[in-house]
């Protein structure tokens, strides 16, 4: 539930909901800004009711290709176009054992 989770985040952090985006297919995204951090809350009809849960983290990096080349393809997927225009995304492989899904996002400089 987007509003329930958003309200809980606002109570815990003082950061109000800044924007809600309809992402299509009944998926909604809500955004909170905590300083330089953007927290994205996502909900969809296929999500089970219950308490809010953490799906994963996305970190913005200056040069996503440099990070991908540094850690290698066994650790991080090859950067590909993200849903956000002009952005690239790469995900850490589950075999790395981070426990929570982690992705990196950077500008598409091509």
What spans do the regions from the language model cover?
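Short, structured motif recognition centered on aromatic/hydrophobic residues
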Residues: 2, 6-9, 15, 32, ...
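Vicinal oxygen chelate
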Residues: 1, 18-40, 48-110
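Short helix/strand-bridging catalytic loops that position acidic/His residues to coordinate divalent metals
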Residues: 23, 45-48
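Short acidic/polar capping segments at secondary-structure boundaries
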Residues: 1-3, 23-24
């Amino acid at each position: 539930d987007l509003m329930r989770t958003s309200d809980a985040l606002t109570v815990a952090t003082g950061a109000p909901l800044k924007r809600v985006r309809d992402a299509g297919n009944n998926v909604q995204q809500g955004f909170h800004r905590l300083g330089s951090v953007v927290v994205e809350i996502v909900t969809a009809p296929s999500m089970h009711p219950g308490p809010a849960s953490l799906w994963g983290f996305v970190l913005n990096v200056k040069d996503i290709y440099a990070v991908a080349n540094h850690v290698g393809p066994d650790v991080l997927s090859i950067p590909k176009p993200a849903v956000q225009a002009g952005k690239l995304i790469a995900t850490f492989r589950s075999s790395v054992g981070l426990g929570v899904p982690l992705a990196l996002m950077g500008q598409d400089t091509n």
